[in-house]
Structures are given as structure tokens and as C-alpha cells.
Amino acid sequence: MTDQEYMLRAIQLAKKGEGWTNPNPMVGAVIVKDGRIIGEGYHKKCGELHAERNAIASLTESAEGATIYVTLEPCCHYGKTPPCTEAIIEQKIKKVVIGSRDPNPKVAGKGAQILRESGITVVQDFMREECDRLNPVFFHYITTKTPYVVMKYAMTLDGKIATKTGASKWITGEPA
């Protein structure tokens, strides 16, 4: 498998958390050693272990010298769970490939910096566009502190939503 395929697998795993992780982001992680996936995980639910720790918990062998592909920069602070950076360092993982940068002020580059200071090779912005697409709601909220709102409004050319008699007509559909 290629680096892109490992990150695509991490993205696929992250999507399993859709609808469950709020207010946290969806994150997936894949641990690779000698060209084989030896662990994988995703953030399943707010308050539970993050993707990196779930991937570590699923290890089939030692992660020493392995590479972890993660869709979002690993956290480096204590919250409902301990920092993922600590777990990565403890496992002696040699390389971390990060998709999206975490805009949360508690992380925002600090996670990558801690890993580098521990002698770990860090690659950032790998398939960033694809990884960023996982969490537009999280990114918007964490940077603006306002809700992410999507609205769809359909009307006829004269600005109406029904006929003069009040009867509804289909004015939108799948193509919209």
C-alpha cells in the first residue's frame, strides 16, 4: 500500500465517528510497520479514547519504529482523555503523518512540536484537503465560536413557495 492509501484508510475510519464525536472532530489513525497495518482506530464518541489511542489499543505487535497516519494533529493536553502525543512517544513510533492541523488553541501546532522535540519525524499537511473535509463544523466552531449553519431554501422565480391557491408544487429536487 502507498502513503495515500494508508491516509485514505484513516479517513475511512474517521467517518465511522460521524454523528457521535461532537463537539470533538472526527479522527482516524492507522499504524503501519514494515508495509503492514498493525493497528487502526478512530474517535468513536466524545469523552472516549481518541483515534490514536484506539489504534494503539488494537496493535497486533510492537509499534516501535512504526509510522502512524492520523487525519488530525494529535492532541497534547489533558481533557477527558490524556494526550495522544504521550501515547505515541511511549510506543516509540518513529514517524507521524498528519493530515489536518488542529486549530484548537490547546493544540495548534503544539502537538507536532512535542513529537518533533521527542525525536519523531513529523510530516504535516499530507492530503490536507481530504482530511479537512472531515471536520468543517469543528473547524468553524473552534475558530469562530459560532455555530456552523447550513440552510437550503427553495422558491419559484416569483419568490413564492406555493401557488396562489396555497397548493404546494415541487420546486426543488435532487439536482438542487
What are these regions (language model features)?
Residues V27-G35, Y153-A154:
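Short beta-strand scaffold segments in enzyme catalytic cores
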Residues K44-A57, I171-P175:
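A short, polar/charged loop-to-alpha-helix boundary motif
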Residues K44, T71, G99:
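Conserved residues at the C-terminal ends of beta-strands
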Residues R53-Y78:
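Mobile, glycine- and charge-enriched loop segments
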Residues E40:
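Short glycine-/small-residue motifs
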Residues M1, P23-V30:
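Polybasic, low-complexity association/targeting segments
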Residues M1-T21, I37, Y78-A176:
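Zinc-dependent deaminase
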